[in-house]
């Protein structure tokens, strides 16, 4: 019998449906899984005809999956004027495509279990993620449907990474200024990468290896330099952008970088009572992305992704504060979900951010 691990807030999630300002049926190409597609072929009547006409078939040449055709306004054709799903209304929730049932939930499978989470791109999920206080808490349950399929070696390697991630969680939530915390996380990640490499490739240690500049450099000082932030924002602006509000946010921040850097400490002092939100974001990004190191052995890069992601959101918070005089709770949710929507659901984007070398920008 395997396990399922979930953040403690997971069970509190409820889709807010038509009250959502960022409907997940608008602006996203929604794939239709094979089981749902087979069922939709059997639906009778006018609705069945309209349902099938709304689906673009899979294309073997391009590798594109079957998906709902978006209309001219990039809405799912089965989203009615009240922003309610007609599949749900006509056929029931259990007949929705798998991705529609799951979103914003995501799943990561391991040799003897599974981890579930909620994506930050959803405003209802972002509300829960930002609201947490204290150390991260998780619910772990045994599950009949999750079998133990891995070898002993695979499980051992996973447990090493789980232990490393637990140490990072602790650092992310300790009572310390954000920059000090980021520097500790970066140094810890560098040490963890070396430990992980030694585990995979147990060559004799070079006792004469000198300490490098990177070992003693401050990640935060390097990140909050104008040259680093300019390079980073240019990278983000070069990604495929889904919605214009994201481009507007990035270009606005880029135009005011000197002021953002100069006033950042004032912002952090003014919003000291919400410092835990950045702890929660660090924890969220570590939980969601760190264990992907099983696939590429890039432990340090996964921590880099969490650091850059959280710091970019903070950068945009400072810009919002300068532009509007405050960062409302709703504005914070909007910034978080925009970042997640634009970055986390494109593997090329996350890989490039994970590989973005902050310390190299100092050279």
Model-derived segments and spans:
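Short runs of predominantly hydrophobic/aromatic residues within well-ordered alpha helices
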Residues: 17, 21, 161, 165, ...
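General secretory precursor processing signal
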Residues: 18, 23, 27-28, 79, ...
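Short glycine-rich, low-complexity/disordered patches
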Residues: 51-67, 180-185, 326-329
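Immediate flanking context of iron-sulfur cluster ligation sites
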Residues: 2-20, 55-97, 114
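Long, low-complexity, compositionally biased intrinsically disordered regions
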Residues: 2-22, 111, 124-126, 130, ...
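A structured, charge-rich N-terminal accessory region that forms the first stable segment of a protein
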Residues: 22, 26-59
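Internal, well-ordered alpha/beta segment that forms a basic, Gly-enriched binding/recognition surface
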Residues: 83, 90-183
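Hydrophobic, aromatic-lined core segments that form the binding pocket/scaffold
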Residues: 175-363
């Amino acid at each position: 019998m395997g396990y399922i691990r979930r953040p403690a807030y997971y069970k509190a999630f409820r889709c807010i449906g038509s009250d959502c300002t960022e409907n997940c049926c608008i602006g996203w190409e929604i794939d239709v899984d094979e089981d749902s597609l087979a069922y939709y072929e059997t639906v009778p009547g006018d609705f069945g005809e309209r349902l099938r006409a709304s689906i673009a078939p899979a294309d073997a040449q391009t590798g594109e999956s079957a998906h709902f055709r978006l209309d001219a306004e990039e809405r799912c054709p089965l989203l009615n004027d009240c922003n309610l799903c007609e599949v749900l209304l006509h056929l029931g929730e259990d007949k929705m495509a798998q991705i529609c049932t799951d979103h914003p939930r995501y799943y990561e499978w391991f040799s003897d279990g599974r981890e579930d989470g909620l994506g930050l791109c959803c405003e209802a999920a972002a509300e829960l993620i930002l609201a947490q206080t204290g150390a991260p808490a998780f619910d772990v349950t045994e599950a009949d449907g999750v079998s133990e399929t891995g070898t002993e070696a695979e499980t051992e390697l996973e447990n090493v990474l789980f232990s490393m991630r637990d140490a990072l969680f602790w650092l992310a939530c300790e009572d310390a200024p954000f920059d000090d915390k980021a520097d500790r996380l970066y140094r810890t990640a560098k040490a963890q990468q070396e430990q992980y490499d030694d585990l995979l490739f147990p060559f004799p240690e070079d006792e004469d290896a000198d300490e490098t500049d990177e070992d003693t450099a401050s990640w935060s000082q390097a990140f909050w330099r104008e040259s680093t932030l300019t390079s980073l924002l240019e990278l983000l602006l070069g990604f495929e952008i889904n919605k214009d509000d994201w481009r507007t946010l990035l270009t606005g921040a880029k135009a005011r970088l000197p002021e953002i850097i100069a006033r950042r400490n004032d912002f952090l002092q003014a919003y000291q009572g919400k410092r835990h939100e950045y702890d929660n974001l660090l924890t969220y990004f570590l939980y969601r992305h760190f264990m992907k190191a099983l696939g590429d052995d890039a432990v340090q890069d996964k921590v880099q992704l969490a650091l850059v992601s959280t710091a970019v959101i903070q950068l945009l918070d400072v810009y919002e504060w300068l532009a509007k005089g405050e960062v409302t709770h709703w504005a914070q949710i909007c910034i978080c979900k925009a970042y997640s929507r634009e970055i986390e659901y494109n593997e090329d984007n996350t890989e490039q951010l994970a590989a973005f070398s902050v310390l190299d920008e100092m050279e």
